[in-house]
């Protein structure tokens, strides 16, 4: 059996073919050179035969043809965020060598229909799309969060990323252009982009990259709005989750494909940019008060808030201490610079990982030491609330909703049984609160990396709770709690999507503990995962496995995802 990193005569021929297509410098084969692509941000990592970095859609198409002709497993990768390890290989019993086709160099955006829609090519990062739309007073589906680690537009679509924008729902489109490998093992191009590009694959992809089409070649845009049908779906307080990765309503071709197709471009809606939103910072020691506020706003006869983000005190503290570098870069510099620094950190960690006594977290250790000398970066009122309240909610509303929302909150907290408080953020407090909330995920990862010699590891849980669940914040049994060093809770509260990070004590069986926590959540009617997809840590349900088999009948793409067979033809 050929292992992922092994080579054969045929494999050498494939390397030569890749080099003819993309150039020698864009075909990586050494362990050090491929590690930034093969090792995930949190999970995943294993040997690969090669990383190929095409610079055009046509090169991408040709590299795929070579891979299929040489019986290689193909992992399409736009941005190796690897939150659950799904953007790279795992340590599985693969029967073919693995090639990662990294699309990072293909990052163009084409705005169409008066910027009401965007065509994002294979490797377009969210930061590029955000910048392109800002000139037109528009914004994409995702506004902040995964943008800070360089996440891509297509990665969001492929994984049904939800994000903080509660009016918009999961990242989803029915319009994409992609390649699949059919039952006969042949590569075919499918153009469902809604743009006529011709029948020849290479001509079509070249025209797409150059934006060469006329207005009559493009189907009309949908009606403009600052929300999708998800908004009304979310308002229903019913015993089922609002959104989760296995929801069939959000699985269509590229959407939710999890790397089981080679996606060249997606067409997505854009939204009017929010001008002068208001952020209410809410603190309480009673979880039911936050749920009452959630239902109050969901049931109100007014537009939904823009976002409602939860953060517990433990997550707050982790973000303040271990996410300070991310906070500073994003607050005082730019997401684009943070993305470059993230890439540099990954490269540096890979470079120093083989040096005895240094290990795989060199860049994290240096960054943590440098930024720890800075004083606390958070505003005074936020720190006061941190000391007084266990639970924090960042409620963001449109300018037109400010007065009504403030009135609702004042009346709510005026009732004697309610013990929490709120304040309206200044512009500085608004930015700081948002960055601290979205720094929580990277902070938990940083903490676990720096403490790796003294802990068993990190268990991240990504869960969609029932929309009617009053007891949304779990209380773990003592026998589980005793196995944990740290636990942190944060999430998209109005959607009842929680991110729950657990750092397990040394000697704990991580897989068994993960399964136990997942079982407890599922007993409560929750669905896992919610928005980070299955990757290498969640087992696919049968319905998802059948869906992936329809997309990829020969198991050419991202084989082994979600605990499925890594073998050809799903053997």
UniProtKB/Swiss-Prot annotation:
Its EC number is 1.1.5.12. Its main location: membrane. Residues 44-273 form the FAD-binding PCMH-type domain. InterPro entries: D-lactate_DH_C-sub1, D-lactate_DH_C-sub2, D_lactate_DH, FAD-bd_PCMH, FAD-bd_PCMH-like_sf, FAD-bd_PCMH_sub1, FAD-bd_PCMH_sub2, FAD-linked_Oxase-like_C. It comes from the Bacteria. SUPFAM superfamilies: FAD-binding/transporter-associated domain-like, FAD-linked oxidases, C-terminal domain. The keyword Nucleus does not apply. GO terms for biological process: lactate metabolic process; respiratory electron transport chain; transmembrane transport. Disruption phenotype: Inactivation results in the loss of the ability to grow with D-lactate. Optimum pH is 7.0. It is an enzyme of class 1 (oxidoreductase). Induction: Constitutively expressed. Gene3D superfamilies: 3.30.465.10, D-lactate dehydrogenase, cap domain, subdomain 1 (3.30.70.610), D-lactate dehydrogenase, cap domain, subdomain 2 (3.30.1370.20), Uridine Diphospho-n-acetylenolpyruvylglucosamine Reductase, domain 2 (3.30.43.10). It is a peripheral membrane protein. It is found in: Cell membrane. PANTHER family: D-2-HYDROXYGLUTARATE DEHYDROGENASE, MITOCHONDRIAL (PTHR43716:SF1). This is Quinone-dependent D-lactate dehydrogenase. It comes from Corynebacterium glutamicum (strain ATCC 13032 / DSM 20300 / JCM 1318 / BCRC 11384 / CCUG 27702 / LMG 3730 / NBRC 12168 / NCIMB 10025 / NRRL B-2784 / 534). The lineage of its organism: Bacteria, Bacillati, Actinomycetota, Actinomycetes, Mycobacteriales. The gene is dld.
């Amino acid at each position: 059996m050929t292992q992922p990193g092994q080579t054969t005569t045929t494999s050498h021929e494939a390397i030569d073919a890749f080099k003819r297509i993309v150039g020698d410098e864009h075909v990586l084969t050494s362990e050090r050179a491929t590690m930034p692509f093969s090792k995930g941000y949190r999970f995943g990592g294993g040997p690969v035969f090669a990383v190929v970095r095409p610079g055009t859609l046509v090169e991408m198409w040709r590299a795929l043809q070579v891979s299929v002709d040489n019986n290689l497993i193909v992992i399409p990768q736009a941005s190796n965020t690897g939150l659950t390890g799904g953007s790279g290989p795992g340590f599985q019993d693969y029967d073919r060598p693995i090639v990662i086709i990294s699309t990072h160099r293909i990052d163009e955006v084409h705005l169409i229909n008066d910027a009401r829609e965007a065509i994002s090519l294979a490797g377009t990062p969210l930061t590029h799309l955000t910048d392109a739309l800002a000139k037109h007073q528009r914004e994409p589906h995702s506004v902040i969060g995964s943008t800070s680690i360089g996440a891509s537009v297509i990665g969001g679509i492929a994984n049904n990323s939800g994000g903080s924008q509660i009016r918009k729902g999961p990242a989803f489109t029915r319009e994409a252009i992609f390649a699949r490998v059919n039952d006969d093992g042949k590569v075919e191009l499918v153009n469902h982009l809604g743009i006529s590009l011709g029948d020849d694959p290479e001509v079509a992809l070249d025209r797409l990259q150059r934006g060469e089409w006329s207005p009559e070649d493009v189907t009309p845009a949908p009606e403009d709005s600052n929300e999708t049908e998800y908004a009304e779906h979310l308002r229903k307080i019913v015993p089922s989750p609002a959104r989760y990765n296995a929801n069939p309503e959000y699985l269509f071709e590229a959407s939710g494909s999890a790397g089981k197709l080679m996606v060249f471009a997606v067409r997505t809606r854009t939204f009017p940019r929010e001008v002068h939103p208001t952020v209410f910072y809410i603190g309480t020691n009673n979880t039911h008060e936050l749920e009452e506020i959630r239902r109050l706003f969901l049931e109100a006869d007014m537009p939904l808030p823009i976002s409602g983000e939860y953060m517990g005190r433990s997550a707050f503290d982790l973000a303040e201490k271990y996410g300070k570098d991310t906070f500073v870069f994003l607050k005082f510099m730019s997401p684009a610079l943070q993305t470059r620094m993230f890439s540099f950190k990954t490269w540096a960690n890979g470079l120093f990982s083989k040096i005895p006594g240094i290990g795989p977290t060199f860049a994290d250790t240096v960054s943590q030491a440098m930024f720890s000398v800075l004083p606390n970066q958070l505003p005074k009122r936020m720190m006061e609330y941190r000391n007084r309240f266990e639970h924090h909610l960042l409620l963001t509303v449109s300018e037109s909703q400010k007065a009504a929302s403030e009135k609702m909150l004042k009346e709510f907290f005026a009732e004697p049984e309610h013990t929490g408080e709120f304040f309206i953020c200044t512009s500085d407090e608004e930015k700081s609160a948002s960055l601290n909330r979205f720094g929580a995920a990277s902070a938990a990862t940083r903490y676990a990396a720096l403490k790796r010699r003294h802990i068993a590891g990190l268990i991240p849980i990504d869960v969609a709770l029932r929309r009617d669940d009053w007891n949304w914040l779990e209380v773990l049994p003592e026998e589980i709690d005793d196995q944990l060093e740290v636990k942190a809770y944060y999430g998209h509260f109005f959607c009842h999507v929680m991110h729950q990070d657990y750092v397990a004590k040394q000697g704990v069986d991580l897989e068994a503990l993960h399964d136990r926590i997942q079982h407890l959540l599922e007993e409560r009617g929750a669905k896992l995962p919610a928005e980070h997809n299955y990757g290498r840590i969640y087992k696919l349900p049968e319905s998802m496995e059948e869906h992936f088999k329809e997309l990829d009948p020969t198991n050419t793409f991202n084989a082994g995802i979600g605990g499925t067979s890594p073998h050809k033809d799903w053997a």
